[in-house]
């Protein structure tokens, strides 16, 4: 397999990648790679439209080994591309040579990176990959590394997703281990911003619990922000969708920043206490803002981080690590009104009660052993008072 990297030889870069994976594993961290198998770049080894790579790409020669990967209506300039972007020619996913290159060859793309230490793949635009392709890929991954993880980019409820006229079989045929939980993000945003009640959030969570296999439900990628969405800090207060030029220079006011930061505390608390695997987009813990791509991909603000916010996320991470009920427990909602949300997480004979006060008024709740809390105003023998926009966890 040809691996082209900018600095150093493929062997040197392979060793560097393996060292990265080994260092991550020593710290209990798994490493996923982003697999984009629905299209390539036009300026790539395989298509080579600009002639920047050695060898003959599909654009350069009809005898290219990659010619069968692409759909040409009139070679070389008329070809099928991803959503009409001519810089992203679409791939024939079930082309035998493409299948061998990506999946089945001894040193296929999948095999190569798993052998170097990769722990799985996030599959870009999974809706555009045929069921047969997904099944082959996941089976090959599990053959080489049984505990590796295959995550699909799906924006809707993946259990009943229809794409290109077909009902997808992501879970029925074990094509994916899990998906990116965008419905979760939408429900959290709508609740925190007061657009929906706690009932709408509950309905979203319980619909996924009912529709997804249990093991998928508990390892869903619960996200608040990604490279495909506005920064969560921005999304919590600013709906601006004007032209790119206006987005580039748009910044939150001091008041907006204060409101967004407080809302982020609550949103992240729910992210780490509801079922699923919380995913933190780099910089969200440092108070980064920004609208859509590319303004959500700015450099990390080294030396200008919000340390209190970072410590908040560290506390949430330790909380989830230490409480099996938050990782594996059942969920039952007991409060889901316009202002308040309450649910239990139960596992192994232990029950945690989770409270979230979205309102600007105090909320009295039953007393219990405090496991985690923010904005607790009163701690009495029989009750606790959550302050405005406060949240806490108690144990019976």
Label every PLM stretch briefly.
Residues 1-26:
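N-terminal beta1-alpha1-beta2 submodule of the flavodoxin-like/Rossmannoid cofactor-binding fold
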Residues 21, 39, 48, 52-55, ...:
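Active-site-proximal helices and loops of the catalytic beta/alpha 8
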Residues 24, 34, 113, 123, ...:
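Conserved, mostly hydrophobic/aromatic
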Residues 32-33, 120-122, 149-152, 220-223, ...:
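Structural recognition of the beta-strand scaffold that forms the well-ordered cores
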Residues 85-101, 118-128, 188-196, 248-259, ...:
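The substrate-binding groove and active-site-proximal loops of carbohydrate-active enzymes
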Residues 164-165, 221-252, 268-307:
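Aromatic/acidic polysaccharide-binding cleft in carbohydrate-active enzymes
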Residues 260-261, 273-280, 284-396:
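Carbohydrate-interacting/catalytic domains
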């Amino acid at each position: 397999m040809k691996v082209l990297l900018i600095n150093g030889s493929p062997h040197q870069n392979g060793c560097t990648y393996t060292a990265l994976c080994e260092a991550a594993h020593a710290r209990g961290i798994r490493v996923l790679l982003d697999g984009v198998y629905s299209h390539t770049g036009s300026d790539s080894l395989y298509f080579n439209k600009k002639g920047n790579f050695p060898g003959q790409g599909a654009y350069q020669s009809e005898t290219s080994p990659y010619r069968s990967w692409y759909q040409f209506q009139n070679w070389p300039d008329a070809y099928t591309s991803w959503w009409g972007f001519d810089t992203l020619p679409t791939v024939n996913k079930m082309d035998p040579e493409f299948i061998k290159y990506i999946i089945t060859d001894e040193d296929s793309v999948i095999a190569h990176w798993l052998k170097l230490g990769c722990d799985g793949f996030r599959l870009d635009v999974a809706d555009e990959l045929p069921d047969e392709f997904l099944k082959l890929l996941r089976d090959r991954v599990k053959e080489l590394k049984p505990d590796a993880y295959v995550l699909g980019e799906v924006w809707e409820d993946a259990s009943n997703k229809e794409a290109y006229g077909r009902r997808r079989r992501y879970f029925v045929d074990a094509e994916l281990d899990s998906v990116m939980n965008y419905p979760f993000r939408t429900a959290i945003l709508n609740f925190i911003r007061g657009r929906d009640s706690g009932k709408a959030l509950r309905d979203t969570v319980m619909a996924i619990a009912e529709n997804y296999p249990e093991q998928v439900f508990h390892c869903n990628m619960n996200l608040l922000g990604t490279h495909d969405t506005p920064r969560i800090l921005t999304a919590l207060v600013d709906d601006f969708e004007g032209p790119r030029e206006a987005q580039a220079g748009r910044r939150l006011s001091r008041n907006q920043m204060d409101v967004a930061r407080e809302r982020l505390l609550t949103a992240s608390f729910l992210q780490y206490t509801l079922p699923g695997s919380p995913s933190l987009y780099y910089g969200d813990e440092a108070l980064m803002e920004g609208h859509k791509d590319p303004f959500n991909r700015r450099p990390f603000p080294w030396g200008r981080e919000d340390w209190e916010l970072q410590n908040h996320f560290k506390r949430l991470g330790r909380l989830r690590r230490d409480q099996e009920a938050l990782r594996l427990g059942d969920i039952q909602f007991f409060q889901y009104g316009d202002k308040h949300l309450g649910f239990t997480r139960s596992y192994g004979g232990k029950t945690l009660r989770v409270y979230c006060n979205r309102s600007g008024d105090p909320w009295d709740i039953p007393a219990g052993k405090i496991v985690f809390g923010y904005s607790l105003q009163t701690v009495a023998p029989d009750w606790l008072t959550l302050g405005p926009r406060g949240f806490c966890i108690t144990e019976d």
